[in-house]
From Swiss-Prot:
Family: Belongs to the binding-protein-dependent transport system permease family.
Topology in membrane: Multi-pass membrane protein
Pfam families tied to this protein: BPD_transp_1 (PF00528)
Subunit structure of this chain's protein: The complex is composed of two ATP-binding proteins (MsmX), two transmembrane proteins (MelC and MelD) and a solute-binding protein (MelE).
Gene that encodes it: melD
Function of the protein: Part of the ABC transporter complex MelEDC-MsmX involved in melibiose, raffinose and stachyose import. Probably responsible for the translocation of the substrate across the membrane.
Keyword line: Cell membrane, Membrane, Polysaccharide transport, Sugar transport, Transmembrane, Transmembrane helix, Transport
Name of the protein this chain belongs to: Melibiose/raffinose/stachyose import permease protein MelD
SUPFAM superfamilies tied to this protein: MalF N-terminal region-like, MetI-like
GO cellular component: plasma membrane
Domain (ABC transmembrane type-1): residue spans on this chain: 79-291
Length: 303
């Protein structure tokens, strides 16, 4: 076959291969449609009803559920809790994760084992993790009070304390997911060329100066990824709270996710639960978008 014939043959076949690729998008598009778009639309419609979640009979109530949401004092208390979990977990996961990454990026003998130990809690179910810590903090027979008893200290009911249990939840969430932040930061650190540090040392820059002038600016993409992921995960925290306190005492440790669960299954108030769900979705969307925009701008400024 001549060169011209081969060229013509290739040109005829190539468009057919390209045109067939759109079929590959169908499974992903169907998954998004069935598991994301349809539930969101259905949930939005439920917010305009007084459906109890089980009966086939319900009434359209217009915007009554939204009026109820904004006038309900529980909404704002639980929003404050949710922001506490989301922003608190994000702060501690990133600070501790970065410290772990800086330490384990050094040439130390046990760094492989230490990385595994730090990352191991990520592989445990959040619900199981919550029950593990429940048995540690439990008032009756908990490991913490047994330890305090050895030193003659009176037992404390930490999980029933409205001032303590939100911080315990943040601590557990940080402990479980700090390994993800560490891995992302390690990847970012290992992508920084060593030539930059060698040049800085030759110029007499100390380690602190190298961190703020080289490491931190070049880690900004990793920081952006971690911040956004941690905020989204923290704002929809559910399993650990259910295992530890079930949102109690009262609504002291409720998050928006656990409050929705409580409304739907315990109070049989599906219309209001769906309204809280839509509200939570917009809170997460707005905060994560603002965080992404802010840190993307910081990336540009520090590059």
């Amino acid at each position: 076959m001549s060169e011209i014939a081969r060229d013509v043959h290739v040109k005829q076949v190539k468009p057919k291969k390209q045109s067939s690729l759109w079929w590959m998008y169908i499974p992903a598009l169907l998954s998004v449609l069935v598991f994301m778009i349809y539930p969101f639309v259905k949930g939005t419609l439920i917010t305009f009803t007084n459906w109890n979640g089980f009966s086939q009979v319900y009434q359209w109530v217009g915007f009554a559920q939204y009026e109820r949401l904004f006038s309900d004092p529980d909404t704002w208390h639980i929003l404050k809790n949710t922001l506490h979990y989301g922003l608190g977990s994000t702060f501690f996961q990133n600070v501790v994760g970065l410290l772990y990454a800086l330490l384990l990026n050094q040439s130390i003998k046990t760094k492989a084992v230490t990385r595994t130990i730090v990352y191991l809690p990520v592989m445990i179910s959040p619900l199981i993790m919550g029950y593990i810590w429940y048995f540690f903090f439990s008032y009756d027979g908990g490991a913490l009070n047994d330890l305090l008893g050895v030193f003659g200290i009176s037992p404390i009911n930490a999980l029933a304390s409205p001032s303590l249990n939100p911080w315990i939840i943040v601590m557990i969430n940080t402990y479980q997911y700090v390994g993800i932040a560490m891995v992302v930061y390690l990847a970012g650190l290992q992508s920084i060329p060593k030539d930059y540090y060698e040049a800085a040392q030759m110029d007499g820059a100390k380690q602190g100066q190298q961190f703020f002038t080289i490491t931190l600016p070049l880690l900004m993409p990793s920081i952006t990824i971690n911040i956004v992921i941690n905020i989204i995960g923290g704002l929809k925290l559910f399993d650990v709270i259910i295992a530890l306190t079930a949102g109690g005492p009262g609504n002291a440790s409720q998050s928006m996710s656990t409050f929705m669960y409580d409304l739907y299954f315990k109070r049989q108030d599906a219309g209001y639960a769906a309204t809280q769900g839509i509200f939570m979705a917009f809170v997460i969307l707005i905060i994560s978008f603002c965080a992404l925009a802010y840190f993307k701008r910081k990336e540009t400024e520090m590059s």
